[in-house]
């Protein structure tokens, strides 16, 4: 009898525990994979941000360093590996830190969307003013605070410099005149300025 007692084993219980662990293991790995992918997407969004916008992101220094390094790398494979590293660094963030980053990115995207729409409106208005004299009357009706004499002078000079093939000085000043008369927020103002300068440089 004592020998039979010694042979009593508990492996079946251990196996059952292992089976339970395995039962939860697969969804846990899938969830981890999804979370890692989401963090890499978030990291890619950080890497793609304009430099000034990146400075406003609430990041710990370790993540900021990893993102800056990814921006610096031009080799495709090297950048891919660095982006994976950015994702791993982001796994060390707390939920609150990750949420703060997402909120800041969403806010930045909203600013960019509004600024882009604003830029397109200014450009369309400039085209209309240069193409049709009646467009100035309509613009002044909607924006009575605008300086009509300055607007007329800029339109006349922009048309003349285009005909003569000169650098688009007044063309750019007309952009600023429309933007000022139309009114805009500081964030949109800076973004429209940057985008407007880029477009004008292309046109030049």
From Swiss-Prot:
Keyword Aminoacyl-tRNA synthetase: no
Biased composition (Basic and acidic residues): 23-34
Domain of life: Bacteria
GO molecular function, one term: ribosome binding
Protein's GO biological process: assembly of large subunit precursor of preribosome
Entry annotated with the keyword Cytoplasm: yes
Annotated segments matching region Disordered: 1-34, 182-204
Protein name per Swiss-Prot or TrEMBL: Dual-action ribosomal maturation protein DarP
Record lineage: Bacteria, Pseudomonadati, Pseudomonadota, Betaproteobacteria, Burkholderiales
């Amino acid at each position: 009898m004592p020998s039979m007692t010694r042979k009593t084993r508990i492996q079946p219980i251990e196996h059952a525990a292992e089976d339970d662990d395995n039962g939860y293991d697969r969804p846990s790995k899938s969830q981890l994979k999804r979370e890692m992918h989401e963090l890499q997407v978030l990291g890619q969004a950080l890497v793609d941000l304009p430099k000034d916008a990146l400075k406003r992101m609430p990041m710990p220094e370790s993540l900021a360093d990893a993102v800056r390094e990814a921006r610096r790398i031009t080799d495709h494979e090297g950048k891919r590996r660095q982006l994976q590293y950015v994702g791993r660094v982001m796994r060390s963030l707390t939920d609150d830190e990750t949420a703060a980053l997402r909120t800041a990115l969403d806010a930045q995207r909203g600013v960019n969307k509004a600024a882009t729409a604003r830029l397109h409106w200014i450009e369309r208005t400039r085209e209309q003013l240069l193409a049709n004299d009646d467009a100035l009357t309509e613009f002044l009706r909607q924006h009575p605070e605008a300086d009509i004499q300055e607007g007329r002078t800029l339109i006349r000079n922009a048309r003349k410099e285009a005909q003569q093939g000169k650098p688009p000085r007044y063309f750019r000043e007309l952009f600023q005149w429309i933007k000022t008369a139309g009114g805009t927020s500081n964030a949109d103002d800076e973004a429209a300025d940057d985008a407007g300068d880029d477009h004008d440089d292309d046109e030049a």
